[in-house]
Swiss-Prot record:
NCBIfam families: cinA_nterm, molyb_syn, PncC_domain, PRK00549.1. This is Putative competence-damage inducible protein. Belongs to the CinA family. It comes from Streptococcus equi subsp. zooepidemicus (strain MGCS10565). It comes from the Bacteria. Gene3D superfamilies: 3.30.70.2860, CinA-like, MoaB/Mog-like domain. Pfam families: CinA, CinA_KH, MoCF_biosynth.
Amino acid sequence: MKAELIAVGTEILTGQIVNTNAQFLSEKMAELGIDVYFQTAVGDNEERLLSVIDIASQRSDLVILCGGLGPTDDDLTKQTLAKYLGKALVFDEQAGQKLDTFFAHRKHTARTPNNQRQAQLIEGSVALQNQTGLAVGGLITVDGVTYVVLPGPPSELKPMVKNELVPLLSASHASLYSRVLRFFGIGESQLVTALEDLIKHQTDPTIAPYAKTGEVTLRLSTKADNQALADERLNRLEAQLLSIRTVDNQPLRRLLYGYGEDNSLARETFELLKRSGKTITAAESLTAGLFQAQLTDFAGASQVFNGGFITYSIEEKAKMLGIPLVELQRHGVVSSFTAEQMAAQARCLTNSDIGIGLTGVAGPEALEGQPAGTVFIGLATKNKVESLKVVIGGRSRLDVRYIAALYAFNMVRKALLKSENLL
């Protein structure tokens, strides 16, 4: 099935609001195995809206119109679609009762005849009830084309789509099942190069790479009638691609850190710390607490984190962490020595199992002869202190700091997995 999204509202064209509904709807249609081929925005103008509907009806099987269901004169979506289809507007009793209840509880809010428009449906439509607002949506199929009208506010549209529209559409379509694989330590171009043959010859399942800040994800997708069949196909493709080696001969399996759209290196590390019963601390310079902030984003962070340090200046590194100032001056702030000492001292001072030290040059200027983007990360445990140097080139200060924290999380993650013999 080919779908088209039409956003109705002059405020979208003038840049007053961002059309976030398009992203949400495209995602939901993809989950249903419905291909969205076109997205259009049109102002509150009957003539132009009629033209857009006519174009959409000739090239799409499903036309979804968002916005323009309110009570004012410029809310003309239902009226215009009804005119195009040659149908009348009728009153939906359930939506009308909701209007009655709404105004009965708001004695000081005047009800006008225009409010009745919010309870109108195109004749022959299936009503899509609005759980969070007043304007009823609708679905109607005419001459093989299904038309859907939805309210514009996301707070009304999203529940209506999830609870009303999706069940209606899913009954007649194979669903799209997806799995997101997350990689760290490889760029998008390197990953795509490694998977070139698979991507070039893909049919179903499909592979879609996405570059994120400091990491890359792969979305594997297949259309199937059930989860078991989808898992079988996705498992086969995943095993195939993870066995492939990069240009520097690393198996992709070793660069995979987790799964899921909402996952992160911080979350993976946090879960490993909880599972292993380990505690962690950090002393941060260039990241200024970013590592600790991300770690404590998760409920239950106090199980693995007691506290830490932000030691931005050389004097604070000496005073708060007890590192001899003369040694810091001799080795330099941006050095493996300083990163290791920060990690080791933070660990001892907080009686934690693991200590992390982050120091470097966020930029844009060089520091101590080290170019912008140079980062040293120290990791200390009871038995070992080590450090990692990375150069994050061509990035903003914000990106350097963010990616430095990612490297720190990955360093901890790998150390924890190694202790469990999982790497």
